[in-house]
Amino acid sequence: MVPRLLLRAWPRGPAVGPGAPSRPLSAGSGPGQYLQRSIVPTMHYQDSLPRLPIPKLEDTIRRYLSAQKPLLNDGQFRKTEQFCKSFENGIGKELHEQLVALDKQNKHTSYISGPWFDMYLSARDSVVLNFNPFMAFNPDPKSEYNDQLTRATNMTVSAIRFLKTLRAGLLEPEVFHLNPAKSDTITFKRLIRFVPSSLSWYGAYLVNAYPLDMSQYFRLFNSTRLPKPSRDELFTDDKARHLLVLRKGNFYIFDVLDQDGNIVSPSEIQAHLKYILSDSSPAPEFPLAYLTSENRDIWAELRQKLMSSGNEESLRKVDSAVFCLCLDDFPIKDLVHLSHNMLHGDGTNRWFDKSFNLIIAKDGSTAVHFEHSWGDGVAVLRFFNEVFKDSTQTPAVTPQSQPATTDSTVTVQKLNFELTDALKTGITAAKEKFDATMKTLTIDCVQFQRGGKEFLKKQKLSPDAVAQLAFQMAFLRQYGQTVATYESCSTAAFKHGRTETIRPASVYTKRCSEAFVREPSRHSAGELQQMMVECSKYHGQLTKEAAMGQGFDRHLFALRHLAAAKGIILPELYLDPAYGQINHNVLSTSTLSSPAVNLGGFAPVVSDGFGVGYAVHDNWIGCNVSSYPGRNAREFLQCVEKALEDMFDALEGKSIKS
């Protein structure tokens, strides 16, 4: 299984595909066609983005050994050191030189982009649980707008406005502002738009603003991951103008853009959705959507059968739809139900291969569930934030709006699929596998109310470091050991950057965790505070390095990928059990915070692991954890709470309760 990459969210940012038009597609700029009109073209910075650096080999080896230190005993560590030495002076050196040479020949991209696509698209495991994460929206602040039809209409219109704004080049470029008072201003934007694209990044850099890569954005819409034998393909058809809607496992399509590229009137979209919500067709006996949850080779074979049974046109409609809107017929009970429903549901009402599914339950609870190969959390989060803001601040319809009087029976097409016996058998097998797997997944969440970002920053501590330290203490308390831990960090500051790994388990967190968990009475509050400060400093350094492309994980991954591509026998470093162990990420963590996000989550990446989605808010800390039967998520969260209580006690000068 592969490390999950949600992201470490850089605040707001955007991206568009090759040859994307830089100005409106049509004269259709009537009211409500765009959600913003940026004076700086969306892709203005893309050409001048800096390239993702390949770290020096000696730096990578040094960082790798530092990350291994807390996970190994002395004997194991010495062995790993030997493997590293011979790698650095031998085959590793050769591979590194070849990687650097290859990178010089491919200046249009990054050294990680190709191998990363390969890794995702060649993986044969189901995309459900193994790769696809979800992010759930907060409710609309105006409660009557959470009516399912109203919210579905508003979310759909806002999503299409985003699509139009992006393609017209009118979406604000995604920029990380270190000094927004200087760079996030109309004056600066008026100036920078006249700087040629080949130089624009430097102009932003001078005012401490970092434009982010937007190359992933064009795959947000009209895109699907197609199952193929041994390696899947990403398919995009940006000419298609229809939306795919799933309800009760039935498939419907209707156009949301007209022939001139204008958005179909919101009242018509509302009428079509109302028609679909009131359709009394029963759920199909063999729900096709289960197939998207299958092993990729099995699904590839079944898809071929589906095509040759006369379903080619219907599948093309599914694959090319702007996105997939899933309307669920039940309300959400609580946060745990929300997580299960948005992460996997019952398998009948999602097309898991779509670049994203927008899921809306009966009570208006809404989430984005996305396929991960095409893009990372940064692109999805920008879309997410803009859609939330637009749909709540300038909604297209109100709860009182009357749907248009239009004949939806003509406009809305229900897709029917011809199923052979082999396909029916395939769907039944997929359902059985799906149901059995989902039964094994536990999800639980906690909200720690004693404090958050504000308090921790006053204590001069990194809020993220404290959250990560809590996970280390919790695992130590629960299982008595320190294990491989993964935190995703975006490298979108670079052209075609993806993610880098932060390794939160360090000698500092191990020492600090042992002090808090095993012998708190032996240390004064001051000593415990000092250890926390050391952890925070080191975590801050690791985070900065990762964001700057100076981690070790992607570099070692790319060298391994290169060796495999060249048919070179796998170097010993990669056969070392310690390498296997550090990449068996028992704690897989990812943080997301945004005023639009209620919570996010994903499954563990290994069978004996935890999937930890978390957010440190101003005055509270939220944590959403998943596990399989080998681990206890509820108990882990109790240990996380205990760790946070202990740390807050120490910071307030109190003694730790045993």
UniProtKB/Swiss-Prot annotation:
Enzyme Commission code: 2.3.1.21
Gene Ontology cellular-component terms listed: mitochondrial inner membrane; mitochondrial matrix; mitochondrion; nucleolus; nucleoplasm
Lipid bilayer topology: Peripheral membrane protein
Ways its activity is controlled: Inhibited by trans-2-hexadecanoyl-CoA.
Residues carrying N6-succinyllysine: 69, 85, 239, 424, 439, 510, 544
Residue intervals on the Mitochondrial matrix side: 26-178, 209-658
UniProt-reported outcome of changing residue 647 to V: Confirmed at protein level
Reactions mediated catalytically: (R)-carnitine + hexadecanoyl-CoA = O-hexadecanoyl-(R)-carnitine + CoA; octanoyl-CoA + (R)-carnitine = O-octanoyl-(R)-carnitine + CoA; decanoyl-CoA + (R)-carnitine = O-decanoyl-(R)-carnitine + CoA; dodecanoyl-CoA + (R)-carnitine = O-dodecanoyl-R-carnitine + CoA
Location(s), subcellular: Mitochondrion inner membrane
Residue positions where N6-acetyllysine is found in the record: 79, 239, 305, 510, 544
Intramembrane segments: 179-208
Entry keyword set: Acetylation, Acyltransferase, Disease variant, Fatty acid metabolism, Lipid metabolism, Membrane, Mitochondrion, Mitochondrion inner membrane, Transferase, Transit peptide, Transport
GO molecular function terms listed in the Swiss-Prot or TrEMBL record: acyltransferase activity; carnitine O-octanoyltransferase activity; carnitine O-palmitoyltransferase activity
Active site: 372
Residues given in the record as CoA binding sites: 452-464
Gene3D superfamilies: 1.20.1280.180, Chloramphenicol acetyltransferase-like domain, Choline/Carnitine o-acyltransferase, Choline/Carnitine o-acyltransferase, domain 2
Free-text function comment from the UniProt entry: Involved in the intramitochondrial synthesis of acylcarnitines from accumulated acyl-CoA metabolites. Reconverts acylcarnitines back into the respective acyl-CoA esters that can then undergo beta-oxidation, an essential step for the mitochondrial uptake of long-chain fatty acids and their subsequent beta-oxidation in the mitochondrion. Active with medium (C8-C12) and long-chain (C14-C18) acyl-CoA esters.
Family matches, as PANTHER family: CARNITINE O-ACYLTRANSFERASE, CARNITINE O-PALMITOYLTRANSFERASE 2, MITOCHONDRIAL
Record: disease: Carnitine palmitoyltransferase 2 deficiency, myopathic, stress-induced: An autosomal recessive disorder of mitochondrial long-chain fatty acid oxidation, characterized by recurrent myoglobinuria, episodes of muscle pain, stiffness, and rhabdomyolysis. These symptoms are exacerbated by prolonged exercise, fasting, cold, or viral infection. CPT2DM affects most frequently children or young adults, and severity of attacks is highly variable. Myoglobinuria can cause kidney failure and death. Carnitine palmitoyltransferase 2 deficiency, infantile: An autosomal recessive disorder of mitochondrial long-chain fatty acid oxidation, characterized by hepatic or hepato-cardio-muscular manifestations with onset in infancy. Clinical features include hypoketotic hypoglycemia, lethargy, seizures, hepatomegaly, liver dysfunction, cardiomegaly and dilated cardiomyopathy.
Protein name: Carnitine O-palmitoyltransferase 2, mitochondrial
